[in-house]
Design a protein with these regions (language model features):
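Residues that mark the junctions of alpha-helical repeat units in TPR/alpha-solenoid scaffolds
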Residues: 2, 40, 74, 113-120, ...
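TPR-repeat structural position
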Residues: 19-20, 57, 91, 137, ...
Length: 173
């Protein structure tokens, strides 16, 4: 396999839920020197996803942090880190990485592929939920409104707003 073939083969193995084989080929790819940085970063993210499926979250985090040795942290990498903490109910750490991903958007130009929702909407919606769980309802409200501004067809906006309003007395707070 060429270096690039290793990467694409590993992605196919992932799509077919052959996770152990996927990791084997991702590791071969990552050890190669002649790879494009964005492919390396994407391979580390894919490795992390496999380890999350296997419920090996510390290894998943290490895969994501390894990307920092190649270049500045990517928005999608920071979101993946935040998601691991979010799914572990470690909302303070999730908040840190979601906010860091928002702040890193200014460095985004020409730094790989990014999902449209990762340009602020996803992070804002996730921050809303984090703050809601931490009972910081005004911050949850703020980020829900921001998510709505960024994507006004957001299906979560009204349910979130109604849930938050049940806990906030806007006149006395």
């Amino acid at each position: 396999f060429s270096t690039r073939d290793l990467y694409y083969y590993a992605r196919e193995l992932f799509r077919h839920q052959r996770y152990d084989d996927c990791l084997k080929y991702l590791n071969k790819f990552i050890k190669r020197k002649d790879k494009y940085i964005e492919d390396y970063i994407d391979a580390c993210i894919l490795q992390s996803k496999v380890y999350c499926i296997k419920k090996e979250y510390q290894i998943a985090l290490k895969c994501l942090f390894d990307t920092f040795t190649y270049d500045i942290p990517r928005v999608n990498t920071l979101i993946e880190i935040a998601n691991i903490y979010f799914n572990s109910y470690d909302f303070d750490k999730a908040i840190y990485y979601y906010k860091l991903s928002l702040n890193s958007l200014k460095y985004y130009k020409n730094k790989g592929f990014i999902y449209k929702d990762y340009l602020g909407y996803y992070q804002s919606l996730s921050l809303c939920v984090c703050y809601f769980y931490l009972k910081k309802y005004k911050k949850a409200f703020y980020y829900n409104e921001l998510a709505h501004k960024l994507k006004n067809d957001n299906p979560f906006y009204l349910p979130n707003k109604n849930a938050i309003n049940k806990y906030v007395n806007w006149k006395n707070d």
